[in-house]
A protein has these predicted regions:
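HotDog/MaoC-like acyl-thioester-processing domains
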Residues: 1-16, 101-166
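Hot-dog-fold acyl-thioester-processing enzymes
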Residues: 1-101, 166
Length: 166
């Protein structure tokens, strides 16, 4: 892809993506064993996170990474846009797509328990291009709720697509 097309695509995406609702949703089933294994693999020893199922454990805060990454790689491929009368994907070259960061907000959220089914939906926030590299960056604003429609977490995930990939 030549520089002019990359620049044209960047301008298009910076105009179209902000505040756009991302189609679809991502679901994650929270299983006791996976929650405990996740906590143990990062060295957590607090019984609140690794105790028996009968003790009523909750997911450790780091467990948010597991559902955030699933949401990222489930939702982004579903983004379809109409550019110059042609339908296109957000990431034209999926191997140039990169998950860059997460910022978690647990304010007014309930803890995750074994058996919960998490549902993530998102919109795009700010979108910009690093001029020198022509790498496109975007904020993906995720809202994650459980099966009871209770807020579990709000996440700002970073999306980057290398030049030629968008």
């Amino acid at each position: 892809m030549d520089k002019e097309q990359i620049k044209k695509n960047a301008e298009f995406l910076m105009k179209e993506l902000p505040d756009m609702e991302i189609p679809g949703l991502a679901k994650v089933r929270c299983k006791y064993k996976k929650m405990v294994d996740f906590a143990k693999c990062i060295g957590i020893t607090d019984k609140k996170y690794i105790g028996s199922e009968e003790e009523g454990i909750i997911a450790c805060p780091a467990f948010a990474n597991s559902y955030t990454v699933k949401a990222f790689y489930t939702l982004i491929p579903g983004v379809k846009l109409l550019q110059d009368g042609l339908k296109r994907d957000l990431a034209l070259v999926p191997t140039k797509l990169l998950h860059t960061s997460n910022k978690y907000n647990w304010e007014n959220c309930v803890p995750i328990k074994p058996g919960d089914i998490l549902i993530a939906k998102g919109t795009f926030g700010k979108v910009w291009v690093h001029e020198e590299s022509m790498r496109l960056f975007a904020e993906m604003l995720l809202t994650v709720k459980n099966q009871n429609d209770e807020l579990v977490c709000q996440i700002t995930s970073g999306v980057a697509i290398a030049a030629g990939g968008y």
